[in-house]
């Protein structure tokens, strides 16, 4: 099939939704389909068979787009709509495949041209307004809710990335359109040598000192201050904390908090690192932690954590428990004392290692690329009645 994909993202950048989009395209390519991707002017070009990247013009000199809703995206999405409309006018497509807010006009274009539409629902956009503190306006939320319902009603199939979104579609009466596809696929990198791990580890922890690792952005919902408060409770010279990621301004803010808590000597920050380096940092960790205190979507990092064979500590909230349980991780209440105790348990209790082994076995069994590709094929079948090549 010839597919027009609409992605209101900087593609490619190593963050949640662009990573997800990359693997959607890869699976479509491996199934024999061609994808024209209309996306923002920012990002690294990626080479995939059958992929053509069509970028909007850089009319506003915008160099950065933050995660979540922003006013910056409004003019960019208008240009995305114009580019998508132009593509529809000059070329025949069998299907429109939209991500996030591009679903608003992707469904409209599909209706006008009489072709199926697939909506890739990475999140509930009305909920994102609250999660990122973008707006508390009831009017704006009502508008977003109506737009979301319009997209769901007029899409032939909807991909949801977690059980929470699947439940939302069921609640709204669109259960038959939903197909759960967790973002469990990640890039494969060359094997890391023990010598490389040892050298990198020496930068952050003396011999015999264990490392508690966090990887991700420093957005408020991630719970970084909460993690630092827990670190302050673990007064053990055998434990260091390593936080990988974060914008420079956010990192500086957390460094000041670490100084205030008098834990700067055992809490280290790397700032943002290349996505290709993340597996190296994961290999350094003795325990991997996700201290989220809000949100409902499953963090992408959880899948990498489970595959690592390292003990995972996470808050006992729906954002995590859609995937995690106490057989494969250490779940803690979203309280400082509970997180500190959970980390200590994961570091020094043999049972935590048993859970980590069980997690890896489950991930190796369940989180496979053939299964991922099969789900994409099923979504095409649902939308088009065959997912045929052309």
Q: What positions do the PLM features span?
A:
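A charged, aromatic-enriched C-terminal amphipathic alpha-helix characteristic of glycosyltransferases
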Residues: 350-381
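Conserved acidic donor-binding segment of nucleotide-sugar-dependent glycosyltransferases
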Residues: 326-337, 345-350
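Glycosyltransferase donor-sugar binding loop
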Residues: 215, 240-255, 271
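Membrane-proximal helix-turn-helix segments that form the acceptor-binding/catalytic region
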Residues: 23, 82-89, 104, 108-112, ...
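Acidic donor-binding loop of glycosyltransferase active sites
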Residues: 156, 266, 280-297, 310-311
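N-terminal subdomain of nucleotide-sugar transferases
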Residues: 1-45, 226, 234
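Carbohydrate-associated surface elements
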Residues: 164, 184
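Nucleotide-activated donor-binding/catalytic signature segment of Leloir-type glycosyltransferases, i.e.
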Residues: 252-277
């Amino acid at each position: 099939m010839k597919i027009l994909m609409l992605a209101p993202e900087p593609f490619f950048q190593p963050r949640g939704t662009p990573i997800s989009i990359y693997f959607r395209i890869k699976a479509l390519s491996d199934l024999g389909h061609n994808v024209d991707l209309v996306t923002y002017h920012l990002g690294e070009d990626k080479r995939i068979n059958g992929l053509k990247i069509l970028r909007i013009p850089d009319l506003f000199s915008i160099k950065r787009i933050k995660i979540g809703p922003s006013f910056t995206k409004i003019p960019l999405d208008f240009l995305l709509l114009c580019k998508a409309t132009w593509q529809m006018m000059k070329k025949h497509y069998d299907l429109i495949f939209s991500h996030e807010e591009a679903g608003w006009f992707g469904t409209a274009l599909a209706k006008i041209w009489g072709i199926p539409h697939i909506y890739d629902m990475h999140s509930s956009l009305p909920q994102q307004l609250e999660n990122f503190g973008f707006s508390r306006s009831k009017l704006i939320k009502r508008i977003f809710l109506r737009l979301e319902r319009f997209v769901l009603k007029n899409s032939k199939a909807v991909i949801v990335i977690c059980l929470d979104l699947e439940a939302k579609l069921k609640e709204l009466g669109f259960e038959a359109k939903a197909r759960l596809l967790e973002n469990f696929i990640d890039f494969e990198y060359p094997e890391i040598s023990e010598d490389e791990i040892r050298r990198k580890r020496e930068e952050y922890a003396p011999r015999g000192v264990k490392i508690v690792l966090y990887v991700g952005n420093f957005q408020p919902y991630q719970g970084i201050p909460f993690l630092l408060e827990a670190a302050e409770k673990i007064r053990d010279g055998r434990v260091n904390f390593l936080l990988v990621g974060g914008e420079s301004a956010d990192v500086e803010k957390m460094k000041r908090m670490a100084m205030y808590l008098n834990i700067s000597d055992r809490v280290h920050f790397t700032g943002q690192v290349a996505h290709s380096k993340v597996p190296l940092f994961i290999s350094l960790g003795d325990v991997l932690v996700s201290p989220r205190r809000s949100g409902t979507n499953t963090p992408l990092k959880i899948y990498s954590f489970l595959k690592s064979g390292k003990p995972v500590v996470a808050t006992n909230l729906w954002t995590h428990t859609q995937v995690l349980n106490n057989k494969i991780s250490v779940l803690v209440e979203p309280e400082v004392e509970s997180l500190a105790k959970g980390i200590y348990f994961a570091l020094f209790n043999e049972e935590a290692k048993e859970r980590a082994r069980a997690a890896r076995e489950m991930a190796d069994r369940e989180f496979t690329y053939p299964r991922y590709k099969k789900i994409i094929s099923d979504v095409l079948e649902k939308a088009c009645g065959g997912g045929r090549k052309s």
